Swiss-Prot record:
Gene Ontology CC, one term: cytoplasm
Source organism (scientific name): Psychrobacter sp. (strain PRwf-1)
Gene responsible for this protein: rsmH
Identification of the protein by name: Ribosomal RNA small subunit methyltransferase H
List of residues binding S-adenosyl-L-methionine: G56, G57, H58, D76, F102, D123, Q130
Ranges of compositional bias, category Polar residues: 325-339
Amino acid sequence: MTDVPTSAPRSTSKSEFSHETVLLFETVAAVLGEKSLNDNTPKHDGIYVDATFGRGGHSKLLLNYLSDDAKLFVFDKDPEAIDVANDLAAEDKRVIVVHDSFADMTQCLNSRGVSQVDGIMADLGVSSPQLDDGSRGFSFMRDGAIDMRMDTSRGQPVGEWLQTVDEETLADVLYDFGEERHSRRIARAIKGMTQYTSTLELAEVIKQAHPKWQKGKHPATQSFQAMRIFINNELGDIDSFLAQSLTLLAPQGQLAVISFHSLEDRRIKQFLQRHSRGQYPEDENLPMPPQRPRYFSKPKRIAPSKAEVTVNNRSRSAWLRVATRTDTPYNTDPSPQHS
């Protein structure tokens, strides 16, 4: 992507916690199908989706490039994010707020009379305000209840789950969702706790149980990530979200997804590869190689600029993957298509 501004302005919200929107200009340009954003960028008609509104940084910039007749559906599970989204919707009639997971995107849009959209963007994982607010339980640097739910109005907090989960299952969660090599040892230490009420106490137990950790990285990082991903079914939701993009995106519609760790990025990469290569592996028992329809084209990965990483250190691990929906109607029949 060329001629994209190298840093993002600080987004504003009524929250006391600041939030730097990652890959702001790159993401909005990608979801519009533009190489860059400038004064000559045309206003776009159509229907767009911000699948993870957060504090609205991407949505607010996108609205500057949408026509008066365009629509922007914004999704989020977090009630605090929805409060910010409702404030934006009160000011801009183009914004429609949906308090739900992007895993239910198709159902939510269909119920509002929308069957296809022109662009979908998502910024995966936990946001800076969520991390910075100790009461949410995401942070191992600030004390609070061990909650970690994206949607605090439903579901089970991590602290309650830890009271009943067995040691083996906990170890599997730490390994599978946090890629924690010392998962067995850490799980044993966690299950030795008498209560699960403080994130700082939990982080300290993990630290004491961790025999070796990477310099500059808190030893509880991967364990907290694992428990958060598990309790919110984040990977399952991502898989559902990506699958729905096949049917929701109109021909030449744009998909733009930001991820922050390998478990997320690997899923997005494999999904786009699978649906953009257009051919099954060769089978010697078939008379000719079978063809799979190509549902996406031009997949690419974009990293934050050095300037952005300097301004916002949390962007250092971010990757933006973008792709264009082809004109091929989605075929739900998995059988090969012969050319």
